[in-house]
Amino acid sequence: MDKSEFRGTRLKSARLFRGMTLTGLSSATGISKQSISLYENDKNKPEFDNIQKISNALMFPTEFFLQKDSCKTSTEVTYFRSLASATKMDRTSQSIKLEYVAKIYEILSNYIDFPSLNLPTVDFTDSLSDSFEVNNELLCNEIESISSTLRNYWDIGDGPIGNLQFILEKNGIIVTGFDTNENAIDAFSQHTVLNNGDVFFISVDQGKKPEGRIRFDLSHELGHILIHPWSESLDLIDKDEFKLREKQANMFASTFLLPKSSFGKEVQAYPTSLQYYEMLKKKWKVSIQAMIYRSYQLNIITNNQFQYLMRQVSKKGWRQKEPGDKPYFLNANIFQGAIELLIEEKIVSSEGLMRLFRKYGITMFPKDIEDLLSLKKGILSSKTELTPIIQLKRYQEKNEAL
């Protein structure tokens, strides 16, 4: 059994989890920045009262800093959408949060048979090209073919996709969402190596954007998973290549959600009518602006028509909020289903799950884990009802008086 001792790596992990700098933590605790740096690098051991100050500032249980990290995962690459406007701390914080999601996934996989990753093998030549100048038509045709291949592989036809989150999870891609507290990050995907193989996670910034944009974000990240390399750090690629990959992922999302074979035919009826796009939005669950761009991409409308429609969108104030838009939250995800199953089958209680997580070093407050996994509020903090330990005696004589 590992003894309890302060571990600097755990302090750094908790600090970055909260998106806090050394200076910020120093200000919140009254401990010097130099001392905190020494703590994180295990070059000095803090007094217990300082651990308590750190615990309160970072909102982590004191026990967290005295534990060994028993659940090891290896994160390969994280693709962030809107990377250019996100700070390094934004990206690091969200990446660490998703690492904890991966650890919890691995713990639960000891009890739950999660779907295996189910993706076709595709050849995407442009992703391996040394040239960043891409012929749009050729690129679009290639990605159109890949999205069609995936739809056929998953047997979802060429019509509107219903519950995209369910389809992703059914095919082994884990979806979660939490508040990034920043508009700089729309969504991100992460490749993690676990004991039971490779797993891809997608996280979206929910509760701010409408359903159409969330679905586009999910499809965008799916594009990264399917067509882009995951064996290199994004810090090593230049801005031009990153922009190209973002463009390719956007194009994949567009072709995947709005296939040429079906949407392309339907939109031709009234391709310059905003009222018609408003109707199509209810069916395809994609934003009006994305559908207009797709029509232009398919040469159904001219550049002049595209520009005119977008000016009309701006004039109506639809750039930021289209008709029918309201903040969208993910449906109950695979983690919610897994935890409900364990509790309903009396495999483990809510309190038992928290003990299990602590056993593997995931010592957090229930609310943090609920937020990480997009769970119903309170599912991990409900108390197990105690079984009565006393009861009335059964009297032999029915009429015996007290």
Q: What is each stretch, according to the model?
A:
Residues 1-402:
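Active-site hotspot residues in diverse enzymes, especially metal/ion-binding acidic/histidine motifs
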